[in-house]
Amino acid sequence: MASVLNEQSLQQLFISARTHHTWKNTPVSDEQLKQIYDLFKYAPTSVNCSPARIVFVKSAAEKERLLQCVNPGNVEKTKNAPVTAIIGMDLDFYEQLPKLFPHVDAKSWFVGKDTFIEQTAFRNSSLQGAYLILAARAIGLDCGPMSGFDADKVNAAFFPDGRVKVNFLVNIGYGDESSLMPRQPRPSFDEACRIL
């Protein structure tokens, strides 16, 4: 049976963690990005479909291409982030199911069912993007997820073959805590949940 995480871990992953918009001038290494993936890849997805495809944008040239795709309000925060992760969803994810879920013919559940494919890819790549945020926080990084961008432009620039489509973006780095606003309220348990 798994043990309960200590208070420091819970604070780092959830309670004290914040969405960051400004960043310290501290680089994020390729090894850290690999570590993030090697953590979140183990988190669950439907039939282990693992549809997320991540582009970690670090170089100045590629960051400039990405800046042409984001909404004006997201330009500075993206420009100054050491890394921006493009969370994509592979619409051909089911082709990997014979390897990823070999004990049944799960691939046949998806072939020719475009709506089901897109729903599954979107839902599970969203899960994986959230797992990425937690993995980044777990290794001491901060994140700033964003949905303010032109999806067609992102797809044309970074996924031109049409097989992968962007879901959302996540800036990653070491956040500048001095620029954080006070934490905003959240719905209470009774407002958000029911026990039946």
UniProtKB/Swiss-Prot annotation:
InterPro entries, per the entry: Nitroreductase (IPR029479), Nitroreductase-like (IPR000415), Nitroreductase_HadB/RutE (IPR050461), RutE-like (IPR023936)
Family: Belongs to the nitroreductase family. HadB/RutE subfamily.
EC code(s) of this entry: 1.-.-.-
Keyword Protein biosynthesis: no
Pfam families for this protein: Nitroreductase (PF00881)
Cofactor: FMN
CDD domains (alphabetical): RutE-like
Lineage start: Bacteria, Pseudomonadati, Pseudomonadota, Betaproteobacteria, Burkholderiales
Chain segments annotated as transmembrane: none
Cysteines joined through disulfide linkages: none
Sorted UniProt keywords: Flavoprotein, FMN, NAD, NADP, Oxidoreductase
Protein name in UniProt: Putative NADH dehydrogenase/NAD(P)H nitroreductase Pnuc_0932
GO molecular function: oxidoreductase activity
Provenance organism: Polynucleobacter asymbioticus (strain DSM 18221 / CIP 109841 / QLW-P1DMWA-1) (Polynucleobacter necessarius subsp. asymbioticus)
UniProt cross-references to NCBIfam families, sorted A to Z: PRK05365.1 (NF003768)
